[in-house]
Regions:
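Walker B catalytic acidic pair
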Residues: 155
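Zinc-dependent metallohydrolase catalytic domains
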Residues: 76-80, 84-149, 161-476, 481-501, ...
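Non-catalytic architectural context of zinc metalloproteases
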Residues: 1-76
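N-terminal phosphate-binding loop and flanking beta/alpha elements of the actin-like ATPase fold
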Residues: 152
Length: 552
């Protein structure tokens, strides 16, 4: 956390200790938002949340001190209790809206380790092996990403979405990766909305949430550090959820912020593009809140939980096509019809429209588009009534897909049963740079299918165009390359593990990377899979700095 707040922090610690008296060891100091949140609630003494028990997703907290206590910011003991409390608060807020989170992704560690300070880096990460936070020594003093509840909740949000939709992990589409980042920011906001003192403070600033405030501003402390280290780049300003950004086709955007440009501008870098969806979600909360007419802290809690539940269902049920923001929005509308009898349809539609995304009614979003072979003459009751083999063969022919897996998932359309066929296309990255010659990257091509007759099926969603898939994947890989997020495989000796793969040394040297250095912990690596070299995700990063971290 910033050294500039040291004196005020010490005064608050002393007052908290005096009030706690004999019970001081049973409480901890906790920053409920970000250390640099302007007008946010101050650090306070709280009783630490208990460990999660039962059949739920759990953490394995690393480097635990002997006991709880009112430790000062900047100490290892404070960082442990702060990051622990923030992580538990994030899951608690999500579950209050969306119900119990029974486990992390089946590909992730159970329990999931949380590292309060994993070394020196201006960043934070979720890999399927851990959520990890770091420290960095800046001109104004040390900063700790684990000291920010915003940052911890964001990374926990990645883990939550990975539990809901593990298939997003392997996708090489910009909007899929950007939605992952947006979901993390949404969980950070849900965590803030779930805190009573925070709700009171934000409504004192903006009674209807229409004015800029600390809650919709994400990662102030890390953004400050990025600006000191990297100058004016993507990530050098806090991400604002109250924004006027409008959706644009990602492949038409610059891959990174041009020198001298304002970080508020939209680029195809995933953290930048994520702000379009966080803007939609914040506006959903705001619209539900104002439409219900109870502009109180209690009313805000209700509105945020309604929006959080819709977001969770939207993420679970969205069709993973390249336009994922729209797909999640349509799935949120469908969830609202089922959960709330459509009470929030206008709030959702208006929120997405405000950011350039037009949502169709769920009943109109899935209409017959193409006849396919694959009906079943005598279907079993309640089944989708499809011949998976026949439909798969037909779709492969139409997709021009001679290779790649074809996954079949159940898909519900109201009271009707359907199936979702998902082909994984491997896209060549030749021509993007020497580091990616001979490398391929995977992307999903989904089609929703239902039975039309005894001999035919019908596609209810557009049949993907392979050229569009290739264009989107190559653009995403290019943004990773430009932003220094691709690594090459090392030998196992000395390498750490992440996401089931060996960590790899950074090799991508984009224009800015050549000037400012590249993170030694990239989000993607090139791995060998049989005879193929495949672009593989190993982690989600906070996206804060391109400067390589030093050792502990």
């Amino acid at each position: 956390m910033p050294a500039t707040k040291g004196k005020a922090t010490k005064r608050r610690v002393k007052r908290a200790t005096k009030k706690s008296g004999a019970g001081a060891t049973k409480k901890i100091n906790f920053i409920p938002n970000d250390p640099r949140a302007v007008n946010g609630p101050p650090m306070r003494a709280v009783a630490p949340r208990p460990n999660r028990t039962g059949t739920v997703a759990k953490f394995a907290f690393q480097a635990a001190p002997a006991r709880a206590g009112l430790f000062e910011p900047g100490t290892p003991e404070f960082l442990y209790w702060q990051s622990r409390e923030a992580a538990l608060a994030a899951v608690e807020a999500f579950e209050a809206a969306a119900g119990p989170l029974r486990a992390w992704s089946s590909f992730a560690a159970q329990p999931l380790p949380l590292e309060p300070d994993a070394g020196r880096d201006l960043n934070a990460y979720y890999s399927r092996d851990s959520v990890s936070f770091f420290h960095s020594v800046l001109a104004g003093g040390p900063t700790f990403s684990g000291a920010s509840t915003d940052c911890v909740a964001h990374e926990v949000g990645h883990a939550i979405l990975d539990a809901l939709r593990p298939d997003f992990w392997t996708s090489s589409l910009t909007e899929h990766a950007a939605f992952h980042e947006a979901f993390g920011d949404c969980v950070a906001m849900l965590t803030a909305f779930n805190d009573a003192e925070t709700r009171t403070a934000v409504l004192a600033i903006s009674p209807n949430l229409s004015k800029a405030n600390f809650l919709e501003s994400i990662l102030e402390d890390l953004a400050h550090g990025v600006r000191l280290v990297d100058g004016v780049v993507d990530g050098s300003k806090p991400r604002r959820s109250l924004n006027k950004l409008r959706w644009q086709l990602p492949t038409t955007l610059p891959a990174e912020l041009a020198p001298g440009h304002n970080p508020d501008e939209l680029t195809g870098e995933v953290h930048s593009f994520a702000r379009v969806f966080t803007g939609c979600f914040y506006d959903v909360v705001r619209n539900i809140f104002t439409s219900r007419g109870t502009l109180t802290p209690a009313g805000l809690l209700t509105a945020s939980r309604i929006a959080g539940a819709l977001l969770a269902e939207g993420a679970r049920n969205a069709v993973e096509n390249p336009r994922l923001y729209e797909a999640v929005g349509v799935a949120m509308l469908a969830a609202d019809l089922g959960m709330n009898r459509g009470a929030n349809q206008l709030a959702i539609v208006a929120a997405f429209a405000n950011h350039g995304i037009a949502l169709a009614h769920p009943a109109r979003a899935f209409q017959p588009r193409a006849r396919l072979a694959g009906g079943v003459a005598k279907p079993k009751r309640g089944a989708a009534a499809l011949s998976a083999r026949a439909v798969s063969a037909e779709l492969r022919r139409r997709l021009g897909a001679t290779t790649g897996t074809m996954r079949v998932d159940d898909f519900t359309l109201g009271a009707d049963a359907a199936s979702k066929f998902v082909h994984e296309r491997s896209v060549s990255l030749d021509g993007l740079g020497a580091a990616l010659e001979g490398v391929v990257a995977p992307a999903p091509e989904p089609v929703v299918v239902s039975r039309a007759s005894a001999t035919a099926a019908v596609a209810l969603s557009p049949i993907p165009d392979s050229h569009t898939t290739e264009d989107e994947v190559r653009y995403f890989a290019m943004t990773l390359l430009r932003n220094g997020q691709i690594g090459e495989q090392q030998s196992p000796r000395g390498a750490a593990r992440a996401g089931g793969e060996m960590l790899l040394s950074a090799i991508s040297r984009g224009r800015r990377g050549a000037q400012g250095g590249t993170t030694a912990m990239p989000t993607h690596v090139v791995t060998s899979r049989g005879a193929e070299r495949v672009l593989t995700r190993v982690r989600f990063a906070c996206g804060c700095s391109r400067v390589a971290p030093r050792t502990k």
